[in-house]
Amino acid sequence: MEGVQEILSRAGIFQGVDPTAVNNLIQDMETVRFPRGATIFDEGEPGDRLYIITSGKVKLARHAPDGRENLLTIMGPSDMFGELSIFDPGPRTSSAVCVTEVHAATMNSDMLRNWVADHPAIAEQLLRVLARRLRRTNASLADLIFTDVPGRVAKTLLQLANRFGTQEAGALRVNHDLTQEEIAQLVGASRETVNKALATFAHRGWIRLEGKSVLIVDTEHLARRAR
């Protein structure tokens, strides 16, 4: 089983940076624990901390004035969030809520700026992290316009599998820990429509639905449907 230091060292912010410097910074970071369902920060509030998950899952979401929630992404071990507030003094652009119990390492803006000053390579890594997120956002917008709901459901399942999947007897187990409503928010469609697509995939033998997990039996057909 991986240790906390190994998980943190895989974070995008640390890629390509001197390992000794990374280990020194990791030792200086504060460790925090949040129970399942806890809100780490709310959309609109000020913030000056970034977080790197060491265990558990966090959902980032935005809320409409009428209370509706739009789920942006699900993050897991080695993923970083909250960094925008360090470089942009504006309010938080999303809420971060724990899907499961979460352990994380955190640093404030002063600590990060001092580290960037001592290790300029970190600035390039941060730009790469932000660029990858922008690419994913653009791809998600294109999917909402050009891809039907079953296609988006298939793509979402494959993305969750890529992030959280484990091999199990020739299939791929995805323990997503999400409710049906949260899956629908992640897809960007109604729960009824998403459930219909999932039921169709299950009927065709591509997947098996098992509580808050999905067993992907036929990755090839699911990938074709996602195109």
UniProtKB/Swiss-Prot annotation:
Gene Ontology BP, a term: regulation of DNA-templated transcription
The residues covered by the HTH crp-type domain are 147-220
Gene3D superfamilies per UniProt? Jelly Rolls (2.60.120.10), Winged helix-like DNA-binding domain superfamily/Winged helix DNA-binding domain (1.10.10.10)
Q: Which domain of life is it from?
A: Bacteria
**Its Gene Ontology molecular function terms?**
cAMP binding; DNA binding; DNA-binding transcription activator activity; DNA-binding transcription repressor activity; kinase activity; transcription cis-regulatory region binding
| DNA-binding listed as a keyword | yes
A Pfam family found in this protein is HTH_Crp_2
| Annotation: DNA-binding region | 180-199
Biological source species: Corynebacterium glutamicum (strain ATCC 13032 / DSM 20300 / JCM 1318 / BCRC 11384 / CCUG 27702 / LMG 3730 / NBRC 12168 / NCIMB 10025 / NRRL B-2784 / 534)
Q: Lineage in the entry?
A: Bacteria, Bacillati, Actinomycetota, Actinomycetes, Mycobacteriales
Q: Does the keyword Isomerase apply?
A: no
Protein name in the entry? CRP-like cAMP-activated global transcriptional regulator
Q: What does this protein do?
A: Global transcriptional regulator that complexes with cAMP and binds to specific DNA promoter sites, causing DNA-bending, to regulate transcription. cAMP improves binding to specific DNA sequences, probably by altering protein conformation. Involved in the regulation of gntP and gntK genes, which are involved in gluconate metabolism. May form dimers which bind to the aceB promoter region in the presence of cAMP and repress the glyoxylate bypass genes.
Family annotation (InterPro entries) = cNMP-bd_dom (IPR000595), cNMP-bd_dom_sf (IPR018490), Env_Response_Regulators (IPR050397), HTH_CRP (IPR012318), RmlC-like_jellyroll (IPR014710), WH-like_DNA-bd_sf (IPR036388), WH_DNA-bd_sf (IPR036390)
Give a Gene Ontology cellular component term annotated to this protein.
protein-DNA complex
CDD domains listed in its UniProt record: CAP_ED
Residues reported in the UniProt entry to bind 3',5'-cyclic AMP 2:
I145, F146, E181, E182, I183, A184, Q185, L186, V187, G188, A189, S190, R191
Q: Which UniProt keywords apply?
A: Activator, cAMP, cAMP-binding, DNA-binding, Kinase, Nucleotide-binding, Repressor, Transcription, Transcription regulation, Transferase
Which residues make up the binding site for 3',5'-cyclic AMP 1?
67-73, 82-85, 92-93, 137-138
**Induction annotation:** Seems to repress its own expression.
What does the annotation say about its assembly with partners? Answer: Homodimer.
